[in-house]
């Protein structure tokens, strides 16, 4: 990334330049102003302690939003949290927000939910913003044409105290996805295919801009899914230039501009596009028409294949590190090379997370489950990304479809995306999940995770093996 030079700039460079408080001149980090700081219970306690020790207040509490998501249960939310560590973290967040004057959406609040679902649904996430959170998947907000990234606890304290962050410029990458997506192929399949192509380190040190006709055709929910998993390709952030789809999503939301302020904002937002002639450090191309439903077989998001394929054979891999990683992954996943992905049976299906816990995702799942039943021996959890999403799903009759099918329809939270709350796999259980990480033990010690789209998750729940909706016909 570069400072203003009069030369064509990428979208990321434009936002960066607009937020420089003090330039490092290329020798030191730039001091970047932060427009929105999102906070949750896991990465914030030490940051608030640091403020107390230094006798500081939160610099811009009105630009800070907190919500409870990682540790919260998704059933019996009116009861005390059973796990003492989780309970302490949630109670600590509540005390800290009360003391420092930060708005908090707690369990039972209609706006409570996963932080990366709540920000956009409230209209707080807007084009051209810099957004940070002590959470890897902050890149989700880049779907709105924002520069959004996860930060560590010490950086959380710095932003709370100063509303700025010292950062070194990133490299830029363009991921061009052109063509028409085949029926049954979703945003989740695009990002899983990309990570399989470039690897979990392919985007390291870069901000990815997703471009092309296939990206432009996606809803905001689809764009958020793709930007959410940018970090799984090693990228610092992911983004999509704002357009009419973006503006339509934002219009009328609680914190979106209105009246003359909307008109002024729109003028700025419409300038947020990569200039003709701007040069990216790296470019990658995907043919949308060639994509199909994707699923992971291993223990990182890059270890994925089309659902129609088979478990790969490590002995056919020429790279030693790749082969050794594959052998280790297959041993953990208890899979044999050559096994058709569609033959792999699951014990559980999880629909939710900041990747795929929005209303559009739930509609897709409901369409597959309508008039069908979850297979015997399969436990299916459907967890909305926020209580607002849950209320909308209930209003549309989706909750009844889920429960009629035999799925568990839960309250909002991060749930089975990660083993920090009661929703976990038992050791040896296998799960098809719409979340973003399939690391060893991610969903519970010894649990085995296959990352899939909402459509594949729903079809898998019905058949009991990894499947797409086409397999149900």
From Swiss-Prot:
Induction, as annotated: Induced in response to the thiol oxidant diamide.
Q: In which pathway does it act?
A: Amino-acid biosynthesis; L-leucine biosynthesis; L-leucine from 3-methyl-2-oxobutanoate: step 2/4
Q: Look up the domain of life of the source.
A: Bacteria
Enumerate the Gene Ontology biological process terms. L-leucine biosynthetic process
User: Could you confirm whether the keyword 4Fe-4S appears in this record?
Assistant: yes
Under PROSITE patterns, the record lists: ACONITASE_1 (PS00450), ACONITASE_2 (PS01244)
Q: Quote the cofactor binding remark.
A: Binds 1 [4Fe-4S] cluster per subunit.
Q: Which residues form each disulfide bond in the chain?
A: none
Where, in this chain's numbering, is [4Fe-4S] cluster bound? 354, 414, 417
CDD domains named among the record's database cross-references: IPMI (cd01583)
Which positions carry the signal peptide feature in this UniProt record?
A: none
Catalyzed reactions per annotation = (2R,3S)-3-isopropylmalate = (2S)-2-isopropylmalate
Q: Which cofactor does it need?
A: [4Fe-4S] cluster
Q: Which GO terms describe its molecular function?
A: 3-isopropylmalate dehydratase activity; 4 iron, 4 sulfur cluster binding; metal ion binding
InterPro entries for this protein: 3-IsopropMal_deHydase_lsu, Acnase/IPM_dHydase_lsu_aba_1/3, Acoase/IPM_deHydtase_lsu_aba, Aconitase_4Fe-4S_BS, Aconitase_4Fe-4S_dom, IPM_dehydratase_rel_enz, IPMI_cat
Write the Enzyme Commission number(s) for this entry: 4.2.1.33
Per UniProt, which keywords does this protein have? 4Fe-4S, Amino-acid biosynthesis, Branched-chain amino acid biosynthesis, Iron, Iron-sulfur, Leucine biosynthesis, Lyase, Metal-binding
Tell me the Pfam families matching this sequence: Aconitase
Q: What does this protein do?
A: Catalyzes the isomerization between 2-isopropylmalate and 3-isopropylmalate, via the formation of 2-isopropylmaleate.
HAMAP family on file: LeuC_type1 (MF_01026)
Give the UniProt family note. Answer: Belongs to the aconitase/IPM isomerase family. LeuC type 1 subfamily.
Q: What is this protein called?
A: 3-isopropylmalate dehydratase large subunit
């Amino acid at each position: 990334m570069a400072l203003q030079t009069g030369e064509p700039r990428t979208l990321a460079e434009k936002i960066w330049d607009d937020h420089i408080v003090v330039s490092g001149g290329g020798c030191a980090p730039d001091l970047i102003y932060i427009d929105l700081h999102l906070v949750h219970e896991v990465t914030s306690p030490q940051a608030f302690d640091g403020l107390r020790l230094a006798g500081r207040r939160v610099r811009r509490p009105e630009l800070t939003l907190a919500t409870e998501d990682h540790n919260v249960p998704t059933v019996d939310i009116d009861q005390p949290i059973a796990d003492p560590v989780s309970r302490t973290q949630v109670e600590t967040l509540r005390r800290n927000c009360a003391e420092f004057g930060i708005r908090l959406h707690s369990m039972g609040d209609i706006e409570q939910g996963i932080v990366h679902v709540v920000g956009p649904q409230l209209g707080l996430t807007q084009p051209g913003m810099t957004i940070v959170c002590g959470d890897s998947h902050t890149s989700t907000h880049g779907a709105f044409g924002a520069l959004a990234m996860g930060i560590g606890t010490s950086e959380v304290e710095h932003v709370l105290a100063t509303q700025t962050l010292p950062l070194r410029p990133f490299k830029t990458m363009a991921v061009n996805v052109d063509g028409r997506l085949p029926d049954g192929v979703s945003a989740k399949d695009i990002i899983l295919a990309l990570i399989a192509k470039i690897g979990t380190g392919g985007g390291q040190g870069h901000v990815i801009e997703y471009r092309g006709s296939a990206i432009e055709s996606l809803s905001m929910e689809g764009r958020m899914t793709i930007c959410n998993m940018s970090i799984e390709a090693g990228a610092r952030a992911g983004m999509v230039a704002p357009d009419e789809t973006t503006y339509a999503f934002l219009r009328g939301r609680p914190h979106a501009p209105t009246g003359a302020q909307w008109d002024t904002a729109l003028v700025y937002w419409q300038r947020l596009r990569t200039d003709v002639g701007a040069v990216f450090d790296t470019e990658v191309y995907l043919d949308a028409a060639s994509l199909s439903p994707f699923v992971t077989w291993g223990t990182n998001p890059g270890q994925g294949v089309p659902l129609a394929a088979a478990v790969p054979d490590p002995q056919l891999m020429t790279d030693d590190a790749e082969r050794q990683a594959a052998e280790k992954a297959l041993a953990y996943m208890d899979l044999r090379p050559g096994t058709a992905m569609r033959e792999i049976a699951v014990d559980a299906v999880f629909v939710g997370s900041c990747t795929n816990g929005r209303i559009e995702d739930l509609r897709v799942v409901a369409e597959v489950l309508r008039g069908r039943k979850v297979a015997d021996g399969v436990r299916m959890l459907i967890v909305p990304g926020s209580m607002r999403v849950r209320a909308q799903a209930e209003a549309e009759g989706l909750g009844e479809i889920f429960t009629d099918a035999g799925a568990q329809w839960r309250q909002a939270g991060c749930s089975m995306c990660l083993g920090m709350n009661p929703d976990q796999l038992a050791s040896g259980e296998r799960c098809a999940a719409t979340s973003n990480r399939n690391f060893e033990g991610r969903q519970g010690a010894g649990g085995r995770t296959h990352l899939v789209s909402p459509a594949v998750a729903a079809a898998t729940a019905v058949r009991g093996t990894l499947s797409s909706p086409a397999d149900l016909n």
